[in-house]
């Protein structure tokens, strides 16, 4: 006989679980404890493992799906099956675990296509950041989120996963207002025009979009956004608060994002309002060094504005917990670590503006929901719209635990996607633990300097994409994609790859093979 009793004094940490060994059973065995209000790390291993829950309550998250864990629950994990133990109760969650290596079962699991192993039968929603309709797409845009997401979706489908590519146009950006002023149009006209141009350029790039959401043209979007924002406000964490703000010294106009430039208070690089593209850290405009009104040498006036505010510094543990569950590149984790070293990190959720969706709440009649928090809802709305067209019952108001979300975006969007949005989802839907993978790209340079829509320093998609050239462009951008560091698009290098590799090597090889194959008459 072999009797083992649980002893809390001999526990040690493994994968975020307090563990102790049970010896002499012929298989690996032990006791496990997850304390109230905590979760284990997301982990997987080559053993088959069985849990028997003996006390407490919680959930088991297995490859993104959530299952209840109460006394009497027995669950077996196959080799390499990712799992998380989350204690949702007020007492310790205790379980006995038994594990062993079964080479045949492990081999069968590994033999499954990678997408099936990771995503199973779950719906997989792959988002490329909705572009701002203040201009068409250039090769810098196309090489980043859009080509990346397109290739990823194609690969998942080849491996049997149910995956879709979703994007749209980010109509309510302040950059649309500035573009409209410059072009002599209304913001609505500007967004409509460039949204159509963007969709056409994606088509020319042979990028198939399963759901393209045009936020200003969607009749159900505004009310859904207001519902989402109301949920966030009703959580009690987002409240109206007076804070420092910048104003035009002559007109008194409130300045944010596109309206103001200066020096990043964190890294010292040139930055626009609210975000630094270099270090990825947010600013509140008023903390920019040497700020100036865009298009003017005038220094803005410092004042105060009452806006909806999120004390993001209060959610460091929530963000770290979220990052433990999915694919999060090291650079995004480093960004989160830097930001949460700040004692205060207040983020405005609304701004005075005439362009955008006003919140439903009283007291901010001159304000709109800031477009970046808005985008957190926009992704869920895209899933709902896709589902409606497919006859599926997906709802932005009730996100489902088995949804797998995969984001593709440039590093300048990292703060919003990987830090702000998980917090907003937690406030709006506290019972939902979103399973999100993040794929970030660095900037593609053009002849050594940044592509820029606003400065018109770019090679526009429509200027290079034709039915004859699209494969060569896709190949070169994939070959030269800035996945971990900045890369450069050089016209001379593109011509060299086209003429020497694609035509001089590949095409000649195909032509030679065709000429030397025996004809039917010779066989």
PLM segments and residue spans:
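A short, N-terminal "cap"/entry segment at the start of jelly-roll beta-barrel domains
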Residues: 1-28, 33, 41, 106-112
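Double-stranded beta-helix
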Residues: 25-26, 86-116
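Short beta-strand His + acidic residue motifs that chelate non-heme Fe in jelly-roll/DSBH
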Residues: 42, 60-61, 77, 83-89
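Short, conserved beta-strand element in jelly-roll/cupin
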Residues: 45-59
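Short acidic-glycine-tyrosine-enriched beta hairpin
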Residues: 65-78
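Structured secondary-structure scaffolds
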Residues: 112-160, 166-167, 223, 279, ...
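N-terminal, positively charged nucleic-acid-binding surface of large information/translation enzymes
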Residues: 114-320
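Single conserved hydrophobic/aromatic residue that forms the stacking wall/gate
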Residues: 514, 519-523
């Amino acid at each position: 006989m072999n009797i083992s009793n649980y002893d809390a004094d001999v526990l040690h940490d493994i994968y975020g679980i307090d563990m102790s060994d049970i010896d002499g059973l012929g298989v690996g065995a032990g006791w496990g404890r997850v304390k109230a209000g905590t979760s284990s790390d997301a982990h997987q291993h080559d053993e088959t493992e069985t849990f028997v829950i003996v006390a407490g309550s919680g959930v088991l998250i297995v490859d993104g799906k959530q299952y209840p864990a109460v006394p009497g629950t027995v669950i077996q994990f196959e080799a390499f099956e990712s799992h998380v133990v989350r204690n949702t109760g007020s007492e310790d969650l205790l379980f006995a675990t038994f594990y062993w290596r079964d080479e045949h079962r492990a081999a069968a699991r590994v033999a499954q296509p990678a997408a099936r192993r990771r995503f199973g039968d779950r719906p997989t929603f792959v988002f490329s950041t909705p572009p701002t309709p203040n201009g068409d797409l250039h090769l810098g845009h196309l090489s980043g989120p859009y080509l990346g997401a397109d290739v990823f979706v194609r690969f998942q489908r080849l491996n049997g996963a149910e995956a879709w590519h979703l994007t749209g146009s980010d109509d309510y950006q302040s950059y649309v207002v500035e573009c409209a002023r410059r072009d002599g149009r209304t913001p609505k006209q500007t967004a409509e025009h460039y949204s159509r141009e963007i969709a056409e350029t994606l088509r020319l790039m042979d990028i198939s979009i399963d759901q393209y959401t045009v936020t200003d043209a969607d009749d159900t979007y505004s009310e859904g956004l207001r519902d989402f924002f109301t949920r966030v406000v009703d959580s009690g964490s987002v409240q109206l608060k007076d804070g420092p703000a910048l104003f035009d010294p002559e007109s008194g106009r409130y300045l944010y994002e596109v309206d103001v430039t200066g020096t990043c208070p964190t890294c010292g690089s040139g930055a626009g309002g609210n975000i630094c593209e270099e270090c990825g850290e947010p600013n509140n405009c008023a903390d920019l060094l040497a700020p100036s009104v865009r298009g003017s040498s005038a220094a803005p006036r410092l004042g105060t504005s009452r806006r909806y505010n999120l004390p993001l510094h209060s959610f460091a543990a929530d963000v770290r917990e979220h990052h433990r569950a999915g694919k999060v590149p090291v650079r995004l984790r480093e960004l989160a670590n830097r930001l949460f070293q700040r004692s205060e990190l207040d983020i405005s959720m609304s701004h005075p503006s005439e362009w955008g969706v006003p919140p439903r709440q009283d007291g901010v009649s001159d304000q709109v929901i800031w477009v970046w928090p808005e985008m957190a809802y926009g992704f869920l709305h895209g899933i709902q719209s896709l589902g409606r067209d497919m006859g599926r019952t997906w709802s932005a108001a009730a996100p489902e635990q088995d949804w797998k979300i995969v984001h593709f975006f440039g590093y300048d969007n990292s703060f919003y996607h990987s830090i702000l949005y998980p917090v907003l989802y937690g406030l709006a839907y506290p019972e939902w633990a979103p399973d999100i993978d993040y794929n970030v790209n660095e900037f593609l340079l053009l002849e050594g300097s940044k592509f820029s829509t606003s400065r018109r320093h770019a090679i526009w998609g429509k200027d290079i994409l034709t039915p004859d050239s699209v494969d060569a462009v896709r190949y070169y951008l994939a070959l030269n994609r800035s996945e971990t560091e900045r890369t450069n698009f050089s016209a001379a290098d593109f011509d060299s790859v086209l003429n020497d590799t694609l035509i001089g090597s590949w095409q000649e090889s195909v032509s030679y093979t065709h000429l030397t194959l025996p004809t039917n008459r010779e066989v």
